[in-house]
């Protein structure tokens, strides 16, 4: 192993090499670190979107509710497919989960075959931004409907339902939080790709 000290010709003692003289880390090592961070982020993205999807589609709740014109309470279900906004949200989560899985596999392939990195990185960066737009818009749309379910809107006669369907609303809130986290991960991936191109 090479010594990190230089012998002084006058005294014969060794002097340590200054830190500035140490060689910089190899580009191959930094490439591996970047690819590993990218893969970890994409695995987190897949986990977040898949969990949000599962929570959303299992949010159904049935409660005995007094309906207008009916003398006795009747069972009424609250389901995600009652709202077009929630349906759009679920479809966006399906697409995002599938994309996260495919992009993770592509990133692993690029780690094993780095010669294709430049070509596929451009595609991944573009698709990351497209998925960010889709998922963020779906999250915002579903969040608006969820807020009405929580607070209601007396001016137009929309009653709040979260006081009755508490499990349904909790599940939707959890799914929205996970989707927001996934959107932030996509934003990080987009910024990461942009910075990687400049360096």
UniProtKB/Swiss-Prot annotation:
This is CASP-like protein 1D2. Belongs to the Casparian strip membrane proteins (CASP) family. One of its GO terms (cellular component) is plasma membrane. The modification N-acetylalanine is found at residue 2. Homodimer and heterodimers. InterPro entries: CASP/CASPL (IPR006459), CASP_dom (IPR006702), CASPL (IPR044173). Coiled coil: none annotated. The keyword ATP-binding does not apply. The lineage of its organism: Eukaryota, Viridiplantae, Streptophyta, Embryophyta, Tracheophyta. Residues 1-27 are annotated as: Disordered. It is found in: Cell membrane. The chain crosses the membrane at residues 37-57, 86-106, 130-150, 172-192. Residues 58-85, 151-171 are extracellular. It is a multi-pass membrane protein. Expressed in the root endodermis and flowers. Residues 2-36, 107-129, 193-199 are cytoplasmic. Keywords: Acetylation, Cell membrane, Membrane, Transmembrane, Transmembrane helix. NCBIfam families: A_tha_TIGR01569 (TIGR01569).
């Amino acid at each position: 192993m090479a010594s990190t000290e230089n012998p002084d010709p006058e005294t014969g003692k060794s002097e340590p090499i200054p830190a500035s003289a140490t060689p910089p880390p190899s580009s191959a090592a930094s490439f591996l670190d970047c690819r590993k961070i990218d893969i970890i982020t994409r695995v987190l993205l897949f986990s977040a979107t898949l969990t949000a999807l599962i929570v959303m589609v299992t949010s159904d709740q049935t409660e005995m509710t007094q309906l207008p014109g009916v003398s006795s309470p009747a069972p009424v279900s609250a389901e995600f497919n009652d709202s077009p906004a929630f349906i759009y949200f679920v479809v966006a989560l399906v697409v995002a989960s599938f994309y996260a899985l495919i992009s993770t596999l592509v990133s692993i392939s690029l780690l094993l075959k780095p010669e294709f990195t430049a070509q596929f990185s451009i595609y991944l960066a573009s698709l990351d931004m497209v998925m960010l737009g889709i998922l963020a818009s779906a999250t915002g749309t579903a969040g608006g409907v969820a807020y009405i379910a929580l607070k209601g809107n007396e001016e137009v006669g929309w009653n709040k339902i979260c006081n009755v369907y508490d499990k349904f609303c909790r599940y939707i809130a959890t799914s929205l939080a996970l989707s927001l986290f996934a959107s932030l991960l996509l934003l990080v991936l987009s910024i990461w790709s942009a910075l990687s191109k400049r360096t």
